Amino acid sequence: MAGVPVGALLPLLVGVCGAVTGSRVYPANEVTLLDSRSVQGELGWIASPLEGGWEEVSIMDEKNTPIRTYQVCNVMEPSQNNWLRTDWIPREGAQRVYIEIKFTLRDCNSLPGVMGTCKETFNLYYYESNNDKERFIRESQFAKIDTIAADESFTQVDIGDRIMKLNTEVRDVGPLSKKGFYLAFQDVGACIALVSVRVFYKKCPLTVRNLAQFPDTITGADTSSLVEVRGSCVNNSEEKDVPKMYCGADGEWLVPIGNCLCNAGYEERNGECQACKIGYYKALSTDVACAKCPPHSYSIWEGSTSCTCDRGFFRAENDAASMPCTRPPSAPQNLISNVNETSVNLEWSAPQNKGGRDDISYNVVCKRCGAGEPSHCRSCGSGVHFSPQQNGLKTTKVSITDLLAHTNYTFEVWAVNGVSKHNPSQDQAVSVTVTTNQAAPSPIALIQAKEITRHSVALAWLEPDRPNGVILEYEVKYYEKDQNERSYRIVKTASRNTDIKGLNPLTSYVFHVRARTAAGYGDFSGPFEFTTNTVPSPIIGDGTNPTVLLVSVAGSVVLVVILIAAFVISRRRSKYSKAKQEADEEKHLNQGVRTYVDPFTYEDPNQAVREFAKEIDASCIKIEKVIGVGEFGEVCSGRLKVPGKREICVAIKTLKAGYTDKQRRDFLSEASIMGQFDHPNIIHLEGVVTKCKPVMIITEYMENGSLDAFLRKNDGRFTVIQLVGMLRGIGSGMKYLSDMSYVHRDLAARNILVNSNLVCKVSDFGMSRVLEDDPEAAYTTRGGKIPIRWTAPEAIAYRKFTSASDVWSYGIVMWEVMSYGERPYWDMSNQDVIKAIEEGYRLPPPMDCPIALHQLMLDCWQKERSDRPKFGQIVNMLDKLIRNPNSLKRTGSESSRPSTALLDPSSPEFSAVVSVSDWLQAIKMERYKDNFTAAGYTTLEAVVHMNQDDLARIGITAITHQNKILSSVQAMRSQMQQMHGRMVPV
């Protein structure tokens, strides 16, 4: 070192080294990339020039640990340019690094004769590189970071006094992008010693905030940048809001956002989620601590989410986990009864122990017990009424009415709360036994007219529901409707029927009936109105002259012959005779023909069930398996064994629990309807179960299920005769219903059931008469939705359901049967179906469908309902086809499957057109004449082979026009194949 001996600096450097090696603990947010004090052995940095510039000096500290330093002190010579370069320093992902330099510098004023050449600064450079083996210093590659000046410099006196003047400077550089970099120190004439060089970058260290752990994160490239970091929840916790923090450029975490919550059964302790201790619990993921188990409960495991109730205590379903466990209440106290004829009033006091709950209510159980045999009791049944209600009472009194006279009753009053069902016990009830007094009979529910003539009405009625003793006699009160009870007559009878004679013809009379026992008369029934006839009925009785009888019979025969002849003549004029009166307006009853009675006309629907359906003891029924689910409950198969009869298989419809009175009434209405029918092609009602739960409807069991599914499952397996036989059975059943003036309204293959002998039976009689306005034309009813595709046009437009609309539906069923269960109108929407039918389109014949059957379908689909055949005519026609199988051999299509285009009855006769132009003009599609000509379709023989793709290819894209053309094409094709006649004479 020119001008200043190196030895003069060594004592001072030893002191300095002792100071800098005392501690090497750095902040947690700093990651060291290079620390010259930690290098074992020589640093081996490259100096330029190799000699006369920077020198590496090794000095021992007080622990005899070598400290490697670099010195330079060429203060005597001008124009110094001494470079010192570090080894390659890996970046390790840092975008900004910091250089900490500890150094000493000689005061130029303390050196004589160097004022022109001595400097008190040096320069710091860096160079980014992916090459860690560069051997030479290329000054032009380096970029200057800063000029470094000393805050304090030392003199010769300081050396003598061993005064330490160590400088520390920190500089940063970035952003960095390559794998590593080199640092360089340029001396321009200073007397300097580099004691240590440390290169580091800053990070935000791993930390836990709000139960979220944030990993070590390197700071951003700029001194003001913030790095967003998403945290992860610690063990046994879950996110409430997404946990985030920002890592600042100084390595400090800023702005915590979001947090995690300890899972159920865990609480926050010392920044962790630790399990709840024994005897504590936590039910939800919240930020609260574990809570001690509420009264009458405990936990025996760490991490409990709830506490177990003590023996005899319970928790209701809606009770929070924080609520104490409770128990059922004790029995009500001080039960008092007051009997008034066939009514009883009960009052009681609240139980002594409410079980720790406030939701106390009361249930009353009524039992009818035999005299002297209190242990032989049975439920009072549904005929007894409770006011305000039987169960869920909030008051401590109840009135019970409609009891039987002179009968022993036991009433139990149960106190219940939210946990009673977990441990029901007789300890929760108090009972009282009473005997009712004598009482008058209850009102009669129903009066029927068995026969009405010009001057008389034959009445019959059932015994009152509660006779309350022996009925001594009945009293009938009647009067003309117009008199409004101002003038009435009384007739008394000991039987439950009577003939009221001497009435005026064509007059409405109102009748009331009441019963009398030893306790007196009961109330009159409600009014029942009947109207006498205008024409006298023929009477043939004892003493009638045989000659007169013979003449009457002969006259009747002649009259029948005349009527038949008139019908034949009329039949020749019209295919089917038009009805003189709409079917739904025919109200007169033919003598000897049973007529359907609508159960909804009964004031008490239960009376209709009792009248038309047989009550079956539930013990006679064995349910075997569930075969389906209906609107009201499950449908099961099972067996019925009635005493004295053989066991049979049955289908069982059940009414699901929790039903309303309306649901029960609607459910049983189907039984009231079915019970009136007796025909081999109508599903047979075996009976009902109404006196216990579940309420059930029992019908015969049909092994093959619904007709549509059965046909799809057996596609193509039946002969045409077999299919026609099925249709004949359905038609026969519908004729029977029509003769009884019953309109089905929902005739479809899905509502026809098939037994093991392929006998088809009409079912599903639960359909409502109430239809909603629905723009989608799918009317909602109590029995489900009626698709438009089965419904006659007048029923859609005017809600006019008649036997004629059932005939339309029967035609659709015929199509379903012959197509083996295909969906009518395929995937067309309801609105498209309505529009197509209105425009005169009809379904084409299914594959291999005989012409005669398709013609019968088209007859059923006549727009005018009076033009449609009656069910009797349909059955006769099917009988003729069955007797003449050859008539079923001619089919309307030779294709493997029918076209999905509807048939248009307005299609022209093939024989009436001779060219494509004539044909297009006939169907009003002449606008497409050029399209056909350009595509080469110049003859009708070529046209009849076209399909929908062909039409689209020649430029006909409108769906309605495609359908119209294709329907006419199909009709022409059929005419060619059949040799005569049109296929769709609608």
Swiss-Prot record:
Catalytic activity: L-tyrosyl-[protein] + ATP = O-phospho-L-tyrosyl-[protein] + ADP + H(+)
Motif PDZ-binding mapped to chain: 984-986
Record keyword Zinc present: no
Gene Ontology cellular component terms for the protein in this record: cytoplasm; dendrite; early endosome membrane; plasma membrane
Signal peptide (UniProt feature, chain positions): 1-19
Membrane topology of the entry: Single-pass type I membrane protein
Phosphotyrosine: residues carrying this PTM: 596, 602, 779, 928
Domain (Protein kinase) ranges: 621-882
Fibronectin type-III domain mapped to chain residues: 328-439, 440-537
Eph LBD domain segment(s): 30-209
Glycan-carrying positions: 235, 340, 408
Residue span, SAM domain: 911-975
Molecular function GO terms recorded: ATP binding; DH domain binding; GPI-linked ephrin receptor activity; protein kinase activity; transmembrane-ephrin receptor activity
Role description: Receptor tyrosine kinase which binds membrane-bound ephrin family ligands residing on adjacent cells, leading to contact-dependent bidirectional signaling into neighboring cells. The signaling pathway downstream of the receptor is referred to as forward signaling while the signaling pathway downstream of the ephrin ligand is referred to as reverse signaling. Highly promiscuous, it has the unique property among Eph receptors to bind and to be physiologically activated by both GPI-anchored ephrin-A and transmembrane ephrin-B ligands including EFNA1 and EFNB3.
Subunit description: Interacts with the src family kinase, p59-Fyn, through the major phosphorylation site at position Tyr-602. Interacts (via PDZ motif) with SIPA1L1 (via PDZ domain); controls neuronal morphology through regulation of the RAP1 (RAP1A or RAP1B) and RAP2 (RAP2A, RAP2B or RAP2C) GTPases.
Protein name, UniProt field: Ephrin type-A receptor 4
